[in-house]
Amino acid sequence: MIERGKFRSLTLVNWNGFFARTFDLDELVTTLSGGNGAGKSTTMAAFVTALIPDLTLLHFRNTTEAGATSGSRDKGLHGKLRPGVCYAALDVVNSRHQRVLVGVRLQQVAGRDRKVDIKPFAIQGLPTAYQPTQLLTETVDGRQARVLALPELKERVEAIDGVQFKQFNSITDYHALMFDLGVVPRRLRSAADRSKFYRLIEASLYGGISSAITRSLRDYLLPENGGVRKAFQDMEAALRENRMTLEAIRVTQSDRDLFKHLISEATAYVSADYMRHANERRSHLDQALQLRRELLGGRRQLLSEQYRHVEMARELEEQNGAEADLETDYQAASDHLNLVQTALRQREKIERYQGDLEELSYRLDEQSEVAAEAQEQYESCQERSEAAEAEVDELKSQLADYQQALDVQQTRAIQYQQALQALARAQTLCTLPALSADDVESWLEDFRAREEEATELLLQLEQKLSVANAAHSQFEEAYRLVARVVGEVSRSDAWQAGRALLREWPALQHQAQRVAPIGARLAELEQRLNAQQDAERLLQECVKRSGRDCDAQQLDALQAELEAQIDTLTQQAADAGERSMALRQELEQIAGRVGTLSARAPAWIAAQEALNALESQCGETLEESRAVTDQMQQLLEREREYTVERDEIAARKGALEREIERLSQPGGAEDARLIALAERFGGVLLSEIYDDVTLDDAPYFSALYGPSRHAIVVPDLAAVRAQLAGLEECPEDLYLIEGDPQSFDDSVFAVEELEKAVVVKIADRQWRYSRFPSLPLFGRAARESRLETLYTEREALAERYATLSFDVQKIQRLHHAFSRFIGSHLAVVFDNDPEQELRQLQQRRGEIEREFTGQDAQTQQQRQQLQQARELAGLLNRLVPQVGLLADETLPDRVDELREELEQARDAARYLQQHGATLAALEPVIGVLQSDPQQHEQLQQDYQQALQRQRLTKQQAFALTEVAQRRAHFSYSDAVGMLGENADLNERLRQRLEHAEADRSRSREQLRQHQAQLAQYNQVLASLKSAFDAKRDMLQELQQEMQDIGVVADASAEARARTRRDELHAALSENRSRRNQLEKQITICEAEMESLIKRLRKAERDYHLMRTQVTQAKAGWCAVMRLVRDNGVERRLHRRELAYMDADELRSMSDKALGALRLAVADNEHLRDVLRLSEDPKRPERKVQFYVAVYQHLRERIRQDIIRSDDPIDAIEQMEIELARLTEELTAREQKLAISARSVANIIRKTIQREQNRIRMLNQGLQSVAFGQVNSVRLNVNVRDSHAMLLNVLSEQQEQHQDLFNSNRLTFSEALAKLYQRLNPQIDMGQRTPQTIGEELLDYRSYLEMEVEVNRGSDGWLRAESGALSTGEAIGTGMSILVMVVQSWEEESRRLRGKDISPCRLLFLDEAARLDAKSIATLFELCERLEMQLIIAAPENISPEKGTTYKLVRKVFNHIEHVHVVGLRGFSAAAEEEHMAQPLEDTPA
């Protein structure tokens, strides 16, 4: 017997109160005794945490922090730990005597959430000498210990030989190891399994009847019938798949038009694009060639235009040069005319100013004389006035000095000194050293006489000087005139130079008068010379344009030749126009014919393709309409033959199907009624008992039992006898054999075996001889052998049937094709080929276009020649009238001579214009130049000497007068003597002052009069001088301008200048007209060239672009053609009728097909992606790839092993037969796979019966369990009434609900749910789907109700409820239920675990004090009988006799809590108290 595994010990490290404590666990009951808070719950919590380290489940409600606000976060674990690393470890020895240490490392996580970090680990192969506390702690200083961290623990364990350390990252792996080693009773694969296990442990820990377990006892006790359920699901999935396949077949059959639509639209989509690219490629080639022709023609035209432009530019340059010369001449003529007009106006101004100057000169001379006399008088009067003023001032000063001297004695001395000074000054001026105050009067009279004499002499000299000035001014004027004309000349040579000038004056006047006649003659000759030059230029241009040399005499012949050439070119242009019109008419006819043939060609091509398809299908050549009708009649006869043969094959196939169905019955029963009877009688079919017989023994046993091989083996015939009377559904012969199906043998018959036969002695008077059958059907091997043969034959018949059906349908399809061909194409199929005629017309149109191109070039050349000839003729028409002028060769010389004469005359005119007035003024005064009045200077010197002498005598007289006036001051020799004299002197001074003031007044009046008169004279003189200077300056400017103009202004000069200007203006206008014409022509030519260059660039760009496109399209087209030919779809895509549609129609056709294809492939991801990729217009090969993908898709949708066709449409039509055959096979398969409602009911009933028997066996183990008034505990398993009704209907009344089970829209689960709802309408199903409800109904557990019942006192069996039981009774009853659950789990998991493993059994019980002694003894007995370990917590008054008891006392030492533990063995066996191994002194880690 396998020994059950046991938990050896529990170790707590660094828990609250337990630093390092190991509890050795008893093999039965371990009791934790102690008061409140002693650590019993902490110990159990450590065990549970090591067993189920899932923080989502752990919740220790009975904690020391009960009622704390953080309890919801703590879950009761954080408060049981101390800071630092903590451990909880279980030491286990399993059935294989393998020691394993499983546990967890716990550590508080810092923070307010009071979280705990848990890491599970396991240690295998640990020797028994090592204790858990030795591994988890390390001794420090002898009496202290330190808790090892998990990495340190790993290092320590791995250092021990043969020991394995495993750390787990998931709880699932941790529990998987514990299950394999037999630590936990069941495999905990998921969180739900862990939750069930924890709920069981929790219910055990807190005791009582757990509602969480009793409400879901089915989940805890009844194992999930996964195999049966999976079989149902697989069968249902097979049925679902079968039905889906059938539905897909029906959809495929119904979507035949859709597939045709897919291939037709794909063909339209791809072929339209294929032919559009083909047309575009051909069009691009034609366009490239056309662009190249246009490019080459444009280049030729550009060269011609450039040559023409160069010629016109050269002519324009010549015209510009001539125009520049003409403009210069015209501007010179205009300037000359303006100069002549300006010179005439200047001459008039000069004459007017000269007259004004002569008048002003005369007036200025008169006024100068008058002003000079007035100036002399004013100066004389001013001197006299100044003298009077001085005298008055002196007298006043003397009188003031005298008055002052009267007051001051010193004044006299001052006056005396002043008198002496005046005397000294008079002596100096008068050169009289002996002058004294006494003789001053005599000298005063003398000097006054000298003053009068000097004044008279001065007046005489002044009169003489004025006369000499007049003579000198005439000589100076004449000398100035001569110097103005000839420049610097000596005064002695002035008379000779003047006479020479006056002698040349008449000749110059005569020469100047010839300017007008010479200018008129010169203008006429210059006009002729200009005309001659213009004619020469025209002649040179004619020579240049005609390309040959010719002189003036050959111009008439050249003009006649040009007129003939113009007529010829005009006639050629008319002929070319008529030819072009004829060619255009022919082109229009060709275009009309091409349009007609293009409209006919698609129908003819389609008819030819249909005819070729018919010929390939029937294998005959159809050359006329009669052959088509004959072939159609032959098809009808072949169809009738194939149809008859197909019906015969179908009958044979049906017979095989029935035989296969009969042999496929389960258990070898050929009649389904036998299975129902066997279930009813509780027996087994004989064929089922011998189902495993070999193929070699099958003939023997078949002959042995003979007709009774379909018998039913029943345990008791007497029990069956009563049921035979009411049998209705049974075979005609029903054999019943009594025997045990589990140990049945063939000893019931007396048998004698013969050669290939047996003799069976049924009775003494009845024997049965049976030969061995050639095809034995007794036993599964024999039936399978026969079925293989039948399957092979059926497949052959099915293949033949499919072939015949295919042939019939093929003939029918061919017949329909013939019918459609006759209705659609027969009228045009045998007409002439329109494409051949189209090719001929295209060739002719190409010839006409080439002829058009050549004719256009020729017409352009003729047009240019005609234009050049007409321009040359216009030049000749202008040149012929000027032939005589071209012959005059002396004209330039005459013009040069006249230009020299005109220049001389103009020089004379300019000289006279500059010096004519001077010579006219010089002529009357030329005589004064003969004598030079040189004495004029001597006279002036005398005048100056007299003037100096007159001033000196005046000063001497004034000085003597002052001495005479101060003569009285000489007597101031002393102050006293001077007082009397001062009175006389004062009177004299006053008298003299009065006379002096009267003289001063008269002098002032005379001075004012002379001053006013002088100012008036000077003002008049200044105005005259200003006017004279202005006139003279203006005259000089006018004369200078006249000299600068350099034009002789005569009467005819203006007329000649105007005529010359008008002639030049006319020539310039003509030249500008020609230049403008040339500029316009050049502009037009440049515009044409620019337009032509743009067209050429565009044409070149278009040509290169088109060539690039053609090249790229060629590469892409090659890829497309390669892809098309490799996949063999060229015949499908190259539809010639589409070649007659334009690009827009083809694009529209492709777009329409694309829209239809998007809808058609919306459900096919692959085709949808390929179609999306094919929409790229730059990748045409992708459309072909899409077409190939459609072909491949359609090929995959058909049976390629049966259908032999490359055409998807034909293959789809051929597939119809195969689909029909598959439909029949799948229908038969569905009938075989169909889940029988009766069989489902039987399976569920059998499973329910088996589980009820298992629960009954579990109840037997609890019959002797008693707690208080509870005498026994049991589980009651009943079938729910609603579900029992469902089972009855499924097994007996299923025919009434065939609408549910035969519906193809409902699965079996859904039909089962609908039936359940129909039978129980009062039950609310909620939001669950029928599929979910049906799957639940396939689970047998949903049919059962489980209750816990107790036999309590006189009440008998009652439902176990906490309210009806005492606390101890409830705890015991709950413990009994948990033991039953653990046993159930072990049995359920036995097949998953090793056969040599018997798992550990351990439960908890907290607060065991509520149990009485008898109940405690019952628990001990239950643990002993079931080999179960139990950990209970009891107060101090509990002292069980068996097991191990730990006394826990929590103490505080040095502010540190620790739990003091004392262990006690059961005293009934050994009444001795022994202390368990005391741990190391608890110290903080």
Swiss-Prot record:
**Signal sequence segment:** none
Q: Which GO BP terms sit in this record?
A: cell division; chromosome condensation; chromosome segregation; DNA replication
Compartment(s): Cytoplasm, Nucleoid
Region Flexible hinge: what ranges? 666-783
UniProt feature coiled coil, ranges: 311-480, 519-665, 832-1115, 1209-1265
One Pfam family from the record: MukB
Record's keyword terms, sorted: ATP-binding, Cell cycle, Cell division, Chromosome partition, Coiled coil, Cytoplasm, DNA condensation, DNA-binding, Nucleotide-binding
Give residues annotated as binding ATP.
34-41
One GO cellular component term: nucleoid
**InterPro entries per record:** MukB, MukB/SMC, MukB_hinge, MukB_hinge_sf, MukB_N_dom, P-loop_NTPase
Quaternary context: Homodimerization via its hinge domain. Binds to DNA via its C-terminal region. Interacts, and probably forms a ternary complex, with MukE and MukF via its C-terminal region. The complex formation is stimulated by calcium or magnesium. Interacts with tubulin-related protein FtsZ.
Give the family per the record: Belongs to the SMC family. MukB subfamily.
UniProt remark on domains:
The hinge domain, which separates the large intramolecular coiled coil regions, allows the homodimerization, forming a V-shaped homodimer.
- Known function: Plays a central role in chromosome condensation, segregation and cell cycle progression. Functions as a homodimer, which is essential for chromosome partition. Involved in negative DNA supercoiling in vivo, and by this means organize and compact chromosomes. May achieve or facilitate chromosome segregation by condensation DNA from both sides of a centrally located replisome during cell division.
Q: Which PANTHER family match?
A: CHROMOSOME PARTITION PROTEIN MUKB, DUF4476 DOMAIN-CONTAINING PROTEIN
Q: What is this protein called?
A: Chromosome partition protein MukB
